[in-house]
Each structure stands twice: as structure tokens, then as C-alpha cells.
A protein has these predicted regions:
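Duplex nucleic acid-engaging cores and interfaces of nucleic-acid transaction enzymes
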Residues: 49-52, 59, 63-318, 322-423, ...
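Low-complexity, acidic/Ser/Thr- and charged residue-rich accessory regions of DNA metabolism proteins
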Residues: 141-153, 207, 245-270, 274, ...
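Accessory alpha-helical DNA-binding modules that contact the DNA backbone or grooves
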Residues: 30-31, 46-147, 481-624, 631, ...
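A glycine-rich phosphate-binding loop feature that marks nucleotide/adenosyl-phosphate handling sites
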Residues: 180-188, 319-323, 377-379, 403-410, ...
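Short beta-alpha connecting loops at secondary-structure transitions
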Residues: 18, 341-348, 371, 413-426, ...
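Long, charge-rich intrinsically disordered scaffolds of nucleic-acid metabolism proteins
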Residues: 96, 401, 407, 412-482, ...
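Short, ordered loop/turn segments at secondary-structure junctions
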Residues: 37-39, 128, 238, 321, ...
């Protein structure tokens, strides 16, 4: 199999593009680097396509390795024919290779192998030949052998049937067709283990759906219900169709005396050997596809969350709400530095509201706080009411926003948080994190395990290695899309930069602490363990805002500096113009990109990227994202009435809809059917995490704390 051709066909790209990307990956280049700085080589493949290409490359190479292992094993047994070799080499999935290898795989002793040891294989072959003139039972008398524990003709016939059943089970073509029949016509059934038991799985207590139509979220929910011992799950296969197919394949002489025995063989082969394995395979395959779909949605949600626009230039009060232990506060300046921390007790059981307000008024006045970032955890509702009362009593124009606390407690108790804030307790660290999440969501959220951020579904049921890798790739893509400030970025942020490992990230911080600020990107080569290859991969994503070379503040890669200087001279600019932001109209001066690229001896796509960077240096792509909703008044769930129209923020997107924060401490659900008038396969076609949407209240259940919303207004 030509892997590059196969990948190109699957992804709908040219073979040359696939080959170039594979070559760069093999040379140790990262996906963000290839996507950003090797556009000429790959024909400008996006990071998403490159990720898919990488996944398929790993799978197909593993498949080729498996084929070679299987071929070697069969050849060693002296059973490899040219036809079998061709079939194995043409197989496109690991399941197909397994099916072909099944008859030759070293087996534990089975009923068939025991029957062969008893000398019953000739009888099996005779039955399969279907040319007997006597009944198979009569023929079986010739194989009675008490020494080998074949005492009767029935023993001999049963042994021969076992041999034939295993032969049918081992047939790769039969298995492939049965798998297809089951997927096309089979149903997944689920029933309650205890019909009286109350659970979140009650809708699956009497459930059936076609395997070919099952939605991913249903598969994951049913699997969890089975795991938690609420559900009994099985596949209802089209048994009659399958047995009819096997009979047609096996019984070539329907009127021969062997026909009835061969029908018994197909029934036994299917029920005892094939069906349990096919059910396991199909359920595993369905779960894996559902898991991959859920991971994709999780990744998209995480990407939107990480790419939320920073709220710059504001002094923020981070508020970690609680009851008994008090609300922890942290004042954070626009650079993220913690100016002050304290604890107030406005909530039960102490209810020291006036005292708390006095502390808050003092902090707002002293530090010129303009924004309060309130965590959405325990005591958040009570804290919000106090904030709203306070804002009505003070002259300062302060607003508040409720932020998702997910992962904050994990971070605040971590070794990283202890190193960052050794003088603070867990609550104060959490409050500081609340504030910083508003100021720079990406820089703060990278400190938290992506799985703890709370924008996925069923993440604890998934393959954790696969989930971690996928989410790490999302974080890596976001960090490199935005770029990092080399002189302020934490090790947590730096380790996601292309070509930078955890060890190198720590070494960069150590170098900065020992030698002061980086004055140029080239200084990175002085960092321990950061060699030329790592420098090539990371340099373009590192920014130095006040360095010696103004190009260090842009996304222009150092390998293109000479061409960039030549470009500036050709168009009548200098490097000083870049520093002074006097190159805003540079794109209008370029008449012929193709010719200019040839003159500069660089690719046209690279030239276009350089011009874009010079025109808007250090531009943050997050600026294009919707800004968060800032509030100054409170709304309760009991205040909601059907028909009310509100603005809200999408907090989570799942397969069947989206949860929207409308400011009442309970996110409302917009079902996929309520998103738009056209048919959509997935909510992500319409909304993303962080989107600001206008919604209308359909229904409210105060007791169950459920809100149904619609975007069809």
C-alpha cells in the first residue's frame, strides 16, 4: 500500500501535498510549524487537515507493521500462498487483517483442535464434499475409536461438526459479510436491570434503535448505564438473514444427506463462535466512533474557550465564593500581578454583609477596580446578590461577570499553583485564577488539565490517553495561533509552543530569571537543551515586544528576516518604520506578489504572510471572537417566563444541543431542533462555546432547575 496515495485519497488532497507533509513530520517538524511556516511545501494545508493526516499516518504505518508480522507468522507455518499474501497486503483495516489471520493464529485447544487430534478431520472434509450416499451418522461409524475417546458414531459426527464450525467461523469473507449484515439490519437493545430503580438512564429502560442510525451520545449514555449496572445491553442481529447466507455459502447440494448436518454446523458456528465476537467488535467500533465524535466536540469547545478574547487594561477583583470558610478575594492588576488578598463572610452561617461591603468598597476605591470576576460554584448566587447591592451603592462604574470555576480547585491545590503563589492559601489562589481567567483566558487555562475544564461530555468514560493527546493538540494549536510573549509567559504556556518540551520550557524561565529579559529571539539558542531544530520550530511563535529587532515582535520567522528587510527596502520602508507602526499600508504597495516573491527568493504564500504580519504586527486573533457579557444586575430562575427574550453565552456544546448561560445560575438548554429552521447534523454547525446568542425562553421548571430555550425568534 502506498501510504501517501491512500492518505491523499482519504483527505481529498494531492499526493504531493501528503508526501511533503509526511516528509516534514518525519524530519521532526510540528503540526503548528508546518501549517504556519511550510505552506509552499504542503500547498497551505490547515492544522486541522495536518492533524488528521498525522493520525492516519500513524494508523496506516501500524497497519503495515501488523501485516508484516502476520505474513511472517503464516510463512513460518509454511501456509502462505500468493493469493493470501495479496489479500493481506490489500487489507485496509486492522480488523480485515485479523480476519485473514484468524485461521493461522496460534490457538488454545478448542473443540475443533481436540476433534482433529482424535482423527476426525477426514470425516469433516467428507461431509463438506457433500457426495455421501449414506447418512453422515452412518459414515461416522467408520471413525469410532475408543482409544481416542470416540466411543460412538454420535461422538465422531459431533467432532466433525466442531471442526467444520470453526472453519466457518475462521472464514474472513463470511465474517466481513456478517458484520455488514448486522450493522445494516441489526438493532441495539437496552433494558433495565431493575425496572423500579430510579436513574438518569430511565429513557433507555426499554430502548431499541437501528445500529446504523445510533447517535454517538446515545451510545455513550447506554455504555455508561451498562457500566453502572442500570442497563442490560445486547445487539439484536438479523439471525435468519445471516443463517440463510451461511447456508447458501456452505450447502452446495441441498438434497444430499449432508444438508441437515451442514445447517446445524452454520447454526453452531454463528451462535457459538461468530455472534459473540461480532457483537463485541461492533459495540467496540460503535463506542470508538462515538468516543472520537465526543472528543472532537470536546476539542472544538475547548478551542473556543481558550480563544476567548482577553479583557485587557482592567484591575480585576477575583471572587471565589463559599459559605462556612468565607469568600476569598484577590485583586489583580492589568498585568496579572496580585495586589491584595482577603477573606469576607457575607454568606451563611456568618452573614456579615455590611462588613463585607465595607471591605469591598475600600478595595474598589484603593485599587480602582473596574471588574469583578465571580466564580460560579457554591454560594455564587448569594455572592452575586451582594455584588448587585454593592454596585447600586457605589459611584464607581464597576461591572461583574460570572466565570466558570471548572478546574480552579484542581489548579489551586496543584504543585504549580503552590510554586506560583507560595504565600497564599488554596482559596486565595483560586480567587487570583478567577481574575486572571478574564484577563487572559489562554494563559490561565493552560495551567489546568484540559479534561478538568468542563466543556465535554462523558470524558471520564473515554480512552484517557487518546483524549489527553487530542486536547493537548487543541491547546498547542491555540497557543501557537496566538503566540507567546517570551519575557512574560509561564512555563505552563511555553511548554505548548511548537518544539518546546516541558524541560525546555522550565529552562527558558530559569534563563530569564538568571539573565533578565530576552533582547532577541536568537538568545533562545543559549537556553539549555534548546538546539537548532527546536529553535527552528519555536522561534516564530515567540514574541519580544521591546527587543532589539522589531521583527521579533511579529510572527515573521527568523529564517525570513533577510527577505523581510529586502522587502521593506524595495517598498521604501526601514525596520524603524516597523517599530513605529508606519507600515500599515504596505499591502497596497505590492503590485505583483508572484514576481516580488521570485525577486526575494521566497514562496508567494510566505510573502503574503510576511506582508500581513507587517501590516498588523502582534495582532491577536482572539480579538475577532465575541466579547463576554458584563452584568450589573441579577436575574433569578423564578423571574423567567415563557416568551422572554434574553442574550446569553454558550457554555457547552454537546451532540444534541447547547447549554446557554443567561445569567440565572442555571444554564438553559437549546435543543438541536431549536437552533435554526434548516436541518443540521450537529450543533457546532450553528454555535460554538463563547458565542453570544439571543434566545427565547420556551419553558421553566423551577423545581427541577431546568430551562428550555430556543434560538428561533
Amino acid at each position: 500500500m502506498d501510504i501517501n496515495t491512500k492518505i491523499a485519497e482519504e483527505l481529498g488532497i494531492r499526493k504531493e501535498q501528503a508526501a511533503a507533509a509526511v516528509k516534514l513530520i518525519d524530519e521532526g517538524c510540528t503540526i503548528p510549524f508546518i501549517a504556519r511556516y511550510r505552506k509552499e511545501a504542503t500547498g497551505a494545508l490547515s492544522d486541522e487537515i495536518l492533524r488528521n493526516l498525522y493520525d492516519r499516518l500513524v494508523y496506516l504505518r501500524n497497519l503495515e507493521d501488523k501485516k508484516q508480522t502476520v505474513l511472517a507468522s503464516i510463512e513460518e507455518q509454511g501456509k502462505l500462498t500468493e493469493e493470501l499474501r495479496a489479500q493481506i497486503l490489500a487489507a485496509e483495516t486492522q480488523v480485515a487483517v485479523d480476519d485473514l489471520y484468524r485461521p493461522y493464529r496460534p490457538k488454545r485447544r478448542t473443540r475443533a483442535t481436540i476433534a482433529k487430534e482424535k482423527g476426525l478431520e477426514p470425516l469433516a472434509n467428507l461431509i463438506l464434499l457433500q457426495k455421501m450416499t449414506v447418512s453422515p451418522l452412518e459414515e461416522a461409524k467408520n471413525y469410532i475409536n475408543p482409544e481416542k475417546e470416540v466411543s460412538t458414531a454420535e461422538d465422531a459426527l459431533n467432532g466433525a461438526k466442531d471442526i467444520l464450525a470453526e472453519s466457518v467461523s475462521d472464514n474472513a469473507d463470511f465474517r466481513t459479510h456478517i458484520r455488514e449484515l448486522t450493522m445494516k439490519h441489526g438493532q441495539l437493545l437496552s433494558a433495565a436491570k431493575d425496572p423500579e430503580a430510579e436513574s438518569v438512564y430511565e429513557m433507555y429502560y426499554e430502548f431499541s434503535e437501528s445500529l446504523s442510525k445510533l447517535a454517538g451520545h446515545r451510545i455513550l449514555a447506554i455504555s455508561r448505564g451498562e457500566k453502572e449496572k442500570f442497563l442490560i445491553v445486547k445487539i439484536d442481529a438479523p439471525v435468519d438473514r445471516i443463517l440463510s447466507y451461511l447456508d447458501r455459502k456452505l450447502i452446495t447440494a441441498p438434497s444430499a444427506p449432508t444438508a441437515a448436518v451442514l445447517h446445524e454446523v452454520t447454526e453452531d458456528a454463528y451462535n457459538r463462535l461468530i455472534a459473540p465476537a461480532i457483537e463485541r467488535e461492533i459495540r467496540s467500533d460503535l463506542f470508538e466512533k462515538a468516543e472520537d465524535g465526543a472528543i472532537r466536540v470536546f476539542g472544538k469547545n475547548l478551542e473556543q474557550l481558550l480563544m476567548q478574547p482577553p479583557i485587557a487594561g482592567q484591575v480585576v477583583l477575583g471572587w471565589d465564593p463559599a459559605f462556612r470558610t468565607g469568600c476569598k478575594l484577590a485583586v489583580v492588576d492589568p498585568t496579572g500581578k496580585v495586589l491584595d488578598t482577603t477573606v469576607i463572610y457575607p454568606t451563611a452561617p456568618q452573614n456579615r454583609v455590611e462588613e463585607a461591603k465595607a471591605v469591598l468598597k475600600k478595595l474598589i476605591s484603593k485599587y480602582h477596580i473596574t471588574l469583578i470576576s465571580l466564580g460560579n460554584g457554591t454560594a455564587s448566587r448569594e455572592s452575586e446578590q451582594i455584588i448587585v447591592q454593592l454596585l447600586k451603592e457605589i459611584p464607581e462604574p464597576v461591572q461583574y461577570i460570572i466565570v466558570n470555576e471548572a478546574g480552579a480547585s484542581v489548579y489551586s491545590a496543584s504543585k504549580l499553583a503552590t510554586e506560583e503563589f507560595p504565600q497564599f492559601d488554596v482559596g486565595q489562589r483560586s480567587a487570583a485564577s478567577m481574575a486572571r481567567r478574564l484577563q487572559d483566558p489562554l494563559a490561565e487555562l493552560v495551567k489546568i488539565d484540559p479534561k478538568s475544564i468542563g466543556v465535554g461530555q462523558y470524558q471520564h468514560d473515554m480512552n484517557q490517553k487518546k483524549l489527553t493527546e487530542a486536547l493537548d493538540h487543541v491547546v498547542e494549536d491555540c497557543v501557537n495561533r496566538v503566540g507567546v510573549d517570551l519575557n512574560t509567559a509561564s512555563a505552563s504556556l511555553l511548554e505548548y509552543v511548537s518544539g518546546v518540551s516541558k524541560a525546555i520550557a522550565k529552562n527558558i524561565v530559569v534563563y530569564r530569571e538568571e539573565n533578565g529579559k530576552f533582547a532577541s529571539r536568537s538568545q533562545l539558542l543559549k537556553v539549555a537543551k534548546l538546539g537548532p531544530k527546536a529553535y527552528e520550530q519555536c522561534a516564530g511563535f515567540m514574541r519580544i515586544s521591546d527587543g532589539k529587532n522589531p521583527l521579533d515582535a511579529t510572527g515573521v520567522h527568523p529564517e525570513s528576516y533577510a527577505a523581510t528587510k529586502q522587502l521593506l527596502e524595495t517598498l521604501g520602508y526601514t525596520l524603524s518604520d516597523v517599530t513605529d507602526r508606519n507600515v500599515a499600508g504596505i499591502s497596497k504597495k505590492v503590485r505583483d506578489y508572484k514576481k516580488l516573491a521570485q525577486d526575494l527568493e521566497i514562496g508567494e504564500l510566505t510573502l503574503r504572510d510576511i506582508v500581513k504580519e507587517l501590516e498588523t504586527p502582534a495582532r491577536d486573533p482572539r480579538e475577532d471572537m465575541p466579547k463576554p457579557i458584563l452584568r450589573s444586575d441579577v436575574l433569578e430562575i423564578k423571574d423567567l417566563t415563557p416568551g422572554m427574550v434574553l442574550k446569553g453565552t454558550v457554555r457547552n456544546v454537546i451532540d444534541f444541543g447547547a447549554f446557554v448561560d443567561i445569567g440565572v445560575h442555571q444554564d438553559g438548554l437549546v435543543h438541536i431542533s431549536q437552533m435554526c429552521d434548516r436541518f443540521i447534523k450537529h450543533p457546532l454547525e450553528v454555535v460554538s462555546v463563547g458565542d453570544i446568542v439571543e434566545v427565547k425562553v420556551l419553558s421553566v421548571d423551577v423545581k427541577k432547575q431546568r430551562i428550555q430555550l430556543t434560538m428561533k425568534i
